[in-house]
Protein backbone atom coordinates (compact mmCIF):
# COMPACT_ATOMS: atom_id res chain seq x y z
CA UNK A 1 0.00 0.00 0.00
CA UNK A 2 1.64 3.23 -1.18
CA UNK A 3 0.80 6.46 0.63
CA UNK A 4 1.75 10.10 0.14
CA UNK A 5 4.04 11.70 2.74
CA UNK A 6 5.68 15.08 3.27
CA UNK A 7 9.25 15.58 4.44
CA UNK A 8 9.99 18.40 6.90
CA UNK A 9 13.39 19.87 7.75
CA UNK A 10 14.48 18.96 11.28
CA UNK A 11 16.20 22.33 11.80
CA UNK A 12 13.75 24.95 10.48
CA UNK A 13 10.61 22.71 10.44
CA UNK A 14 9.61 23.77 6.91
CA UNK A 15 7.89 21.14 4.78
CA UNK A 16 10.01 21.08 1.64
CA UNK A 17 9.40 17.77 -0.13
CA UNK A 18 6.48 15.50 -1.01
CA UNK A 19 7.03 11.81 -1.70
CA UNK A 20 5.37 8.40 -1.63
CA UNK A 21 6.38 5.30 0.30
CA UNK A 22 5.33 1.70 0.68
CA UNK A 23 3.97 1.27 4.23
CA UNK A 24 4.43 -2.50 4.11
CA UNK A 25 8.21 -2.28 3.48
CA UNK A 26 8.82 0.88 5.59
CA UNK A 27 6.38 0.91 8.53
CA UNK A 28 8.41 3.39 10.62
CA UNK A 29 9.01 7.07 9.83
CA UNK A 30 11.37 7.89 7.00
CA UNK A 31 14.42 10.14 7.52
CA UNK A 32 16.51 11.36 4.57
CA UNK A 33 19.28 13.94 4.14
CA UNK A 34 18.12 16.51 1.58
CA UNK A 35 18.82 20.11 0.63
CA UNK A 36 16.77 22.74 2.47
CA UNK A 37 16.46 26.00 0.53
CA UNK A 38 15.54 27.89 3.70
CA UNK A 39 18.60 26.71 5.69
CA UNK A 40 20.73 26.74 2.50
CA UNK A 41 22.40 23.46 3.46
CA UNK A 42 21.87 19.71 3.49
CA UNK A 43 19.89 18.70 6.58
CA UNK A 44 17.94 15.69 7.79
CA UNK A 45 14.29 15.65 6.70
CA UNK A 46 11.76 13.54 8.62
CA UNK A 47 8.41 12.22 7.50
CA UNK A 48 5.40 14.19 8.73
CA UNK A 49 1.68 13.59 8.41
UniProtKB/Swiss-Prot annotation:
Answer yes or no on keyword Membrane: no
Gene Ontology cellular-component terms for this entry are: cytoplasm; ribonucleoprotein complex; ribosome
Record keywords: Ribonucleoprotein, Ribosomal protein
UniProt entry tagged with the keyword Ribosomal protein: yes
InterPro entries xref list? Ribosomal_bL33, Ribosomal_bL33_CS, Ribosomal_bL33_sf, Ribosomal_zn-bd
Q: Which Gene3D superfamilies is this protein grouped with?
A: Ribosomal protein L33
Any one biological process term the GO annotation gives: translation
Q: Which PROSITE patterns match?
A: RIBOSOMAL_L33
Kindly list the GO molecular function terms attached to this UniProt entry.
structural constituent of ribosome
Q: Which family does it belong to?
A: Belongs to the bacterial ribosomal protein bL33 family.
Q: What is this protein called?
A: Large ribosomal subunit protein bL33
The taxonomic lineage of its organism, from the top, reads: Bacteria, Bacillati, Bacillota, Clostridia, Eubacteriales
Amino acid sequence: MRVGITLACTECKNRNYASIKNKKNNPDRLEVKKYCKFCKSHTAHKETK
